[in-house]
Amino acid sequence: MTVRTDQLIAAPVARLIEEFAKLPGIGPKTASRLTFYLLRAEPKQALALAQAILDVKEQVGYCRRCFNITVGELCAICLDPSRDQTKICVVEEPLDVLAIERTGAYRGLYHVLHGHIAPLEGIYREDLKIEELLARVRSEPVQEVILATNPNTEGEATAFLLLRDLAPLGVRVTRPARGLPTGGDLEWADPETLGSAFEGRREL
């Protein structure tokens, strides 16, 4: 008699594997490895991981100005008086902020859209933080908006829409120079390439 694999795994273990597998970039094999690693780990290590996850969900939110991640009302970048208040770099996700900051090539502010235009995925203009961006451009001393959406089809479509919305507001609109891998995400670009793209950004 053949025993099914799911009958060999205790229910709590199977559930943890299932939850890990729901995370982006985690397949069934990696989910299983992570689960069995935690089974072997000291209880304090597993508890520390669980507590860190809870702390993130309970303490971290979004900046009311730029929508980057923060533990307060405003993020560290928005609170930094040394940042150039005349520039706003528009990105898709908070991870893109981290990627750009690692280059050291940009000292302005940010605005996180939390996604990109993708009608086939049911993501439209109203689902992004676009109106909030336009409100900032109208009310803050902004002179340049850098459209640093990802260099793929969705990112280009989002940049085109933003360019149209920003045109009547009289600000300079730029985009990082060519050289970033087409079809990729900013978070995977190496700091040197990304930094060069920012320094050589082109006007739209």
Curated annotation (Swiss-Prot):
Pfam families: RecR_C (PF21175), RecR_HhH (PF21176), RecR_ZnF (PF02132), Toprim_4 (PF13662)
Zinc finger residue extent: C4-type: 63-78
UniProt key word DNA repair: yes
Biological role stated in the UniProt entry: May play a role in DNA repair. It seems to be involved in an RecBC-independent recombinational process of DNA repair. It may act with RecF and RecO.
Superkingdom of the organism of origin: Bacteria
Organism: Chloroflexus aurantiacus (strain ATCC 29366 / DSM 635 / J-10-fl)
Gene behind this protein: recR
Signal peptide: none
The protein, known as: Recombination protein RecR
Gene Ontology molecular function, alphabetical: DNA binding; zinc ion binding
Gene Ontology BP, a term: recombinational repair
